[in-house]
């Protein structure tokens, strides 16, 4: 049994349900997707849909609710914004699910990720390590966005995994944490992940050191697809090569991270990403094909499940 957690409000349900469908079509064994619902509409909709292996979780409860007076992830005024509260749920949500459901392990996955290969590939690569993280390849250290990405993170519910998890949670909820205002509070919960490897080196696996890499807008220009259908790639020496054990070999890219993807379903168009580091990736016809397919998949999901969203439109769609 694979345990997975994601989150969104109602407006992003089409992305979360696309993730769910991609997992259902690629997973070799049963999985449960725990869905942290950021508003009442998303919680009601998922309960009404009653989809197999998808468990809606109400975040308006003691262990997960937002404290409007709290500072999440940073002591700057921005720490009181809703998005910083959302950042806190990566760690708090995992901790809550471990406690409530006695899960042996879990993957936290952003809702705008889509799997093309079995998630079991990630579990096999991490082996016995208690925590597994993906490095950024587009920027060298130091960087304000952090050397690692929180789009996919794996935790075991054991002493080593919980030591890291509790540390991460404290970073994002405790304004007196010593790493606040020390250069690690610059990108929500993400920059703190750099500390995992430094403080808990024996517990951490870094993806990219073996067979798997992270597909994302900021990484695509460093990859060459050898087999697009199987998502087999090689990559050139990226700026963040020191974040991995750089080896000239073939890798599997089991998922794409469609971050900043904004569709306009009514006009059959979309903006692929708001990623500032690289807007050239859509020049690659294979990447553009993947984005076209993702748009159509999300549109089908939205129509099939009767979703409507005020945020599913963009002012200027770039691709049609």
Predicted features, each with a name:
Residues 1-17:
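N-proximal low-complexity "stem/linker" segments adjacent to membrane-targeting elements
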Residues 22-30:
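Short, acidic, metal-binding catalytic loop of nucleotide-sugar glycosyltransferases
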Residues 33-51:
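Glycosyltransferase specificity loop/lid
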Residues 51-99:
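Active-site-proximal specificity loops/subdomain of glycosyltransferases
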Residues 119, 123-178:
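Conserved catalytic core of nucleotide-sugar-dependent glycosyltransferases
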Residues 160-264, 268:
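Catalytic core and acceptor-binding pocket of nucleotide-sugar-dependent glycosyltransferases
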Residues 240-320:
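Long, low-complexity C-terminal extensions of enzymes
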């Amino acid at each position: 049994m694979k345990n997975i957690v994601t989150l969104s409000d109602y407006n992003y349900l089409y992305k979360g349900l696309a993730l769910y469908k991609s997992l259902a079509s690629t997973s070799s064994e049963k999985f449960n997707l725990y869905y942290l619902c950021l508003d009442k509409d998303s919680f009601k909709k998922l309960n009404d849909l009653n989809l197999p292996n998808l468990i809606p979780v109400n975040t308006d409860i003691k262990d997960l609710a937002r404290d409007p007076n709290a500072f999440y992830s940073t002591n700057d005024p921005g720490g009181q914004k809703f998005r910083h509260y959302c950042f806190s749920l990566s760690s708090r949500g995992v901790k809550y699910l471990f406690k409530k459901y006695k899960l042996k392990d879990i993957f936290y996955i952003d809702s705008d990720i889509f799997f093309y290969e079995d998630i079991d590939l990630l579990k096999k690569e991490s082996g016995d390590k208690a925590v597994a993280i993906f490095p950024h390849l587009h920027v060298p250290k130091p960087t304000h966005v952090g050397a690692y990405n929180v789009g996919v993170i794996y935790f075991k519910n054991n002493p080593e995994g919980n030591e890291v998890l509790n540390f991460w949670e404290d970073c994002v909820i405790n304004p007196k944490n010593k790493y606040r205002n020390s250069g690690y509070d610059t990108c929500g919960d993400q920059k703190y992940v750099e500390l995992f490897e430094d403080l808990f080196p024996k517990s951490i696996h870094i993806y990219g050191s073996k067979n798997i890499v992270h597909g994302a807008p900021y990484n695509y220009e460093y990859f060459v697809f050898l087999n697009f259908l199987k998502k087999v790639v090689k990559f050139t020496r990226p700026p963040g090569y020191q974040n991995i054990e750089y080896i000239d070999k073939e890798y599997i890219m089991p998922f794409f991270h469609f971050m900043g993807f904004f569709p306009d379903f009514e006009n059959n168009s979309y903006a692929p990403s708001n990623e500032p580091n690289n807007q050239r990736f859509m020049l690659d016809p294979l990447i553009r094909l993947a984005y076209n397919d993702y748009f159509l998949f999300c549109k089908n999901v939205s129509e099939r499940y009767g979703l409507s969203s005020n945020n599913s439109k963009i002012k200027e769609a770039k691709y049609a």
